[in-house]
Amino acid sequence: MKNDQKYDIKVQVRTTYLQDQSDPAQEQYVFAYTITINNIGSVASQLVSRHWIITGGDGETREVRGLGVVGEQPLLKPGESFEYTSGTAISSIAGSMKGSYQMVAEDGFHFSVEIPEFILSVPRVLH
């Protein structure tokens, strides 16, 4: 088995615009994102840290780094998944996020998992 199959983590993202927490008059648009992390590899691996790049539609970019996710550093055995919901605010009606998780496998191998870019967008309202 190749290493990339041995250490194989899949990331899926769903987003929701939080209208009740947003304040367009103050250019604050709040979004929730739910992430599902699946270990489809053959070795248990622990998520130890995260790195986000958050970009607003105006081109403003900020980076966020930290240990774990939502206060946890989940250990995922082969076939297991972990899901969490978090949020962010941007100053425009659309933007994006992307990043990576830093993982450590039970055999001590350190690797990075890409979080594919996803869109944050206020839904259009039809009158």
UniProtKB/Swiss-Prot annotation:
Q: Which NCBIfam families match?
A: PRK05461.1
PROSITE patterns the UniProt entry points to: APAG (PS51087)
The record's listing under PANTHER family reads: OS05G0170800 PROTEIN (PTHR47191:SF2)
InterPro entries of this UniProt entry?
A: ApaG-like, ApaG_domain, ApaG_sf, Uncharacterised_ApaG
- Look up and give the organism this protein is from: Nitrosomonas eutropha (strain DSM 101675 / C91 / Nm57)
The record places domain ApaG at 3-127
Q: Which HAMAP family match?
A: ApaG
| Coiled coil residues, start to end | none
Q: How is this protein named in the record?
A: Protein ApaG
Gene transcribed to yield this protein:
apaG
